[in-house]
């Protein structure tokens, strides 16, 4: 599947915490970005050009830049036609089980595969070693990859730029 660089690419960002918001704002300068989240209050904030996180650069971008950014609770609207699905959902570490809870990532990958298997799914969430390979094998695809993030809370947009 080739990407048409003459028109704006649709990118879906799943999750609107520090990682998701910084990616969404950065990419919405030159692409059509849809944020998918489970929290209606966060969706409303994004659709009103307000940040869901405390980050002065993100807040400034939302206030001052012309961004192609919308948010939705509807996974079909978010995934249909997207070239990329960026996964920025929580994977909290459970000290008792000594594991990351990857259920939100797994759910996003399952939904993306069902609704738009052509999209390249890029996992930004923290996951254990080997998890991406197990997802690739489960769905018989090479369109699920991992790209680690190294962002500081409150400086996430700046960290993405640099």
Model-derived regions: residue spans:
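NAD(P)+-binding Rossmann beta1-loop-alpha1 motif at the extreme N-terminus of oxidoreductases
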Residues: 2-50
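Short, well-ordered alpha-helix to beta-strand connector turns
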Residues: 31, 81-82, 141
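Conserved beta-strand segments of alpha/beta enzyme cores
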Residues: 32, 68-70, 143
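N-terminal FAD cofactor-binding segment of flavoenzymes
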Residues: 54
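A structured beta-alpha segment of the ubiquitous adenosine-cofactor-binding alpha/beta core
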Residues: 58-83
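Redox-cofactor binding/interface segments in oxidoreductases and associated redox assembly factors
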Residues: 85-87, 123
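Rossmann-like NAD(P)(H) cofactor-binding subdomain of soluble oxidoreductases
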Residues: 93-155
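Dinucleotide-binding Rossmann-like beta1-alpha1 core, especially the glycine-rich loop
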Residues: 156-162
